[in-house]
């Protein structure tokens, strides 16, 4: 076997990550051992899975374990496993590069704030690189199960690493950390065992260390090379809830989610009946940096009778719950289950439906009993949960109850208003839930469409998330009350208007016919129609979409996304009581009337967040009218 050594350079992103990580995570340096043990555990899971089809991969060594050792004289710590191991190509792809979607987004989000960056780095999954927090040289020797050749990887964590082919009798991976100056406290039996019990007690295979020295009856030191398991070595989710501490639940979450922060909440249950399975599902406290990446994988691991099968399968959790982390362990699925089988499996459908109910129940409990925690959840994951209104018809009503919004009754910009809250505050005679969609909260609050609602003291929901158009396109009513956009269709306040209001509006419409016709003629085919309205109090005009047309806000979003759409023409509603409209009605000069009508239209377009087709002409008209007024 050739032992020729090859020197290669790290991918640029790896160099950046190493530098950032060593600086940002040093205050929590103990996590290096958790991360390396977690990787070793994953390698054991992969061997178990591949060994189902190829038992020969176990090479007559079926007892999977992780071993930790230290050498005070050499100042090294060794982490060894007999899991699946890696081939030469796998070493290069897993360690020399970061082959992750969202890498660019990750680096863009780094702020320079040490605490925030540490959280982001933790989310990204530092894994193997965490070794360089405490080591100035790392030597990794690995042989993939079933292969003859082993490979040794070595680096000082700077710009380069070396690779060479070596001999290795046992399959699996051995990592030797050559500690930096000042890290000698880690070369201690008690210290390492404490770290293992703190962070990795839940790992389902034994993590072994030497028993350590003991003392005889006469005080003599008895040196023992016997190995002992430091951890409990049982799958945490198989234990009774009463036997698991809150800290153990949190540490297991950090292992399974590769997250540094404690979870917000979790659900642990054993389900019996037609399907028998155990679920341990977590709601994270922070959103990952790539939450909105549609290609991002899901975060729930599937086990069958405690044998890891796969992760990141959308069949286990719907896309709108992609933030959920945890494990599902089935007693009934076959061990040789594949992604193809999952696509057709009614058993998996039943498990998924049950787990979705558990997660929604967990969120319902938070919203009812821990509103402050639920507010934290909503801030991080609210926009994603909203996707479920359109994706999950069976649970639409449950999801709708969990939605939170800002409204005209809100004291600040925090979305705390539920649809049930809104209905509880509805005016006598009100039969609709009114809302407006806009690009920003300021644009929504100051929209001319709200003026009559403010006048009558009617609450309006202010929807500014991009996903809100999807929500209102799927949720047509809640608790028997229709959802109605205040910027679409003719104004219908129902019983909120008395007969006197309706009669007065009829008279205004009749009296306004000449000015309506004048504006219609001036604007031509720019608008579907012009009409007098009672929805305006302070503004001269506003644009309204047809009842069944796409909203102007959605139109803008689709165009910004590069979609070619034929937008429908809006209706221009004018306020006959406004001084500008009265001035236009009195204007006898056709050209000036045309300028005034065009300005009314452009102002209405700007007020709803639209973009002028010809800004220069708008400026000229405004300048011209201002000069005439100053004469």
Swiss-Prot record:
Region of interest: C: 557-631
Residue ranges the record marks as coiled coil: none
Chief location bin: cytoplasm
Keywords carried by this UniProt record: ATP-binding, Chaperone, Cytoplasm, Nucleotide-binding, Stress response
Pfam families, per database record: HATPase_c_3, HSP90
Family of this protein: Belongs to the heat shock protein 90 family.
UniProt name for this protein: Chaperone protein HtpG
């Amino acid at each position: 076997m050739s032992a020729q050594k090859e020197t290669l350079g790290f991918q640029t992103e790896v160099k950046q990550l190493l530098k950032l990580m060593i600086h940002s995570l040093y205050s929590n340096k103990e996590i290096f051992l958790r991360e390396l043990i977690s990787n070793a555990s994953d390698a054991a899971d992969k061997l178990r899975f591949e060994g189902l089809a190829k038992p020969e991969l176990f090479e007559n060594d079926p007892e999977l374990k992780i071993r930790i050792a230290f050498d005070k004289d050499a100042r090294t710590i060794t982490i060894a496993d007999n899991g699946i191991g890696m081939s030469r190509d796998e070493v290069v792809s897993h360690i020399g590069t970061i082959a992750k979607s969202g890498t660019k987004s990750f680096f863009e989000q780094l702020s320079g704030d040490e605490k925030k960056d540490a959280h982001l780095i933790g989310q990204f999954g530092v894994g193997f690189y965490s070794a360089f927090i405490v080591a100035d040289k790392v030597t990794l020797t690995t042989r993939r199960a079933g292969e003859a050749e082993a490979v040794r990887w070595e680096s000082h964590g700077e710009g380069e690493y070396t690779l060479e082919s070596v001999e290795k009798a046992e399959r699996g991976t051995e990592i030797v950390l050559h500690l930096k100056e000042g890290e000698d406290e880690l070369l201690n039996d008690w210290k390492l065992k404490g770290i293992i019990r703190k962070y990795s007690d839940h790992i389902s295979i034994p993590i072994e260390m030497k028993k350590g020295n003991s003392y005889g009856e006469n005080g003599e030191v008895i040196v023992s090379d016997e190995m002992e398991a430091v951890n409990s070595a049982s799958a945490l989710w198989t234990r009774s809830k009463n036997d698991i501490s809150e800290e153990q639940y949190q540490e297991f979450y950090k292992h399974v989610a590769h997250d540094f922060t404690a979870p917000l909440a979790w659900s642990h249950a054993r389900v019996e009946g037609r399907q028998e399975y155990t679920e341990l599902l977590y709601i994270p406290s922070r959103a990952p940096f790539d939450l909105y990446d549609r290609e991002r994988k899901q975060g729930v691991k599937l086990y069958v009778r405690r044998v890891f099968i796969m992760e990141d399968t959308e069949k286990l959790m719907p896309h709108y719950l992609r933030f959920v982390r945890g494990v599902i362990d089935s007693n009934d699925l076959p061990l040789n289950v594949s992604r193809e089988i999952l696509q057709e499996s009614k058993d998996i459908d039943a498990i998924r439906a049950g787990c979705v109910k558990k997660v929604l129940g967990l969120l319902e409990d938070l919203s009812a009993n821990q509103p402050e925690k639920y507010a934290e959840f909503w801030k991080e994951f609210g926009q994603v949960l909203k996707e479920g209104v359109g994706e999950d018809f069976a649970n639409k009503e449950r999801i709708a109850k969990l939605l939170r919004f800002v409204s005209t009754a809100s004291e600040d910009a925090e979305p705390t208003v539920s649809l049930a809250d809104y209905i509880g505050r509805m005016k006598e005679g009100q039969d609709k839930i009114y809302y407006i969609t806009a690009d920003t909260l300021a644009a929504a609050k100051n929209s001319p469409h709200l003026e009559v609602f403010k006048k009558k003291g009617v609450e309006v929901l202010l929807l500014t998330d991009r996903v809100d158009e999807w929500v209102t396109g799927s949720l047509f009513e809640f608790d028997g009350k229709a959802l109605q956009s205040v910027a679409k269709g003719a104004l219908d306040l129902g019983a909120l208007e008395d007969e006197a209001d309706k009669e007065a509006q009829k008279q205004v419409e009749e009296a306004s016919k000449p000015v309506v016709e004048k504006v219609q003629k001036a604007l031509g085919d720019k608008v579907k129609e012009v009409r007098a309205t009672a929805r305006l109090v302070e503004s001269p005009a506003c644009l309204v979409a047809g009842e069944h047309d796409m909203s102007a806000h959605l139109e803008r979003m689709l165009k910004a996304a590069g979609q070619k759409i034929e937008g429908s023409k809006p209706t221009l509603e004018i306020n006959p009581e406004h001084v500008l409209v009265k001035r236009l009605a009195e204007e006898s000069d056709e050209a000036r009337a045309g300028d005034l009508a065009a300005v009314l239209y452009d102002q209405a377009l700007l007020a709803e967040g639209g973009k002028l087709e010809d800004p220069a002409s708008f400026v000229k008209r405004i300048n011209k009218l201002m000069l005439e007024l100053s004469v």
